[in-house]
Amino acid sequence: MPTVTEGRLIAKGMKFGIAVSRFNDFICSRLLDGALDALTRSGAEGKDIQVYRVPGAFELPLVAKKLAVSQRFEAVICLGAVIRGATPHFEYVSAEVSKGIANASLDTGVPIAFGVLTTDTIEQAIERAGTKAGNKGWDAAMTAIEMVDLLRQI
């Protein structure tokens, strides 16, 4: 039988940095609420969570990487919302944010959870920020907790 290792969802004693976009704040504030709720319900204390507000989703990768290399956090959580409009701006921003966050995590070895919504409509974003489709901020926080614990075991 193979040995299977997976992270536990216990955040006690873990330190988290959260980078959250101010753009589309009516969505991002709900994502932040979900992430904070997940962290505290899983045992994290307020003193172990730092929130950093960035202008928009495009700025998330840089701040995430800076937080990761600071060695003050065991995981970083990125929260934002990119909603499609009438121009190709959506494609450029969502692609660069996704790549930038992934690269920051791979470059630093620090888990950086992706809680950035990329939706076609405002309604879809609202659904994913705490209504019909759950809260992706919560999901990103749970991913961060699990990854910290898993990496501790490796």
UniProtKB/Swiss-Prot annotation:
GO molecular function term, any single one: 6,7-dimethyl-8-ribityllumazine synthase activity
Residue sites binding (2S)-2-hydroxy-3-oxobutyl phosphate per the record: 86-87, 128
Residues holding 5-amino-6-(D-ribitylamino)uracil: 23, 57-59, 81-83, 114
Domain of life: Bacteria
GO cellular component: cytosol; riboflavin synthase complex
Record keywords: Riboflavin biosynthesis, Transferase
Role played: Catalyzes the formation of 6,7-dimethyl-8-ribityllumazine by condensation of 5-amino-6-(D-ribitylamino)uracil with 3,4-dihydroxy-2-butanone 4-phosphate. This is the penultimate step in the biosynthesis of riboflavin.
Name listed for the protein in its UniProt record: 6,7-dimethyl-8-ribityllumazine synthase
Organism: Syntrophus aciditrophicus (strain SB)
Encoding gene per record: ribH
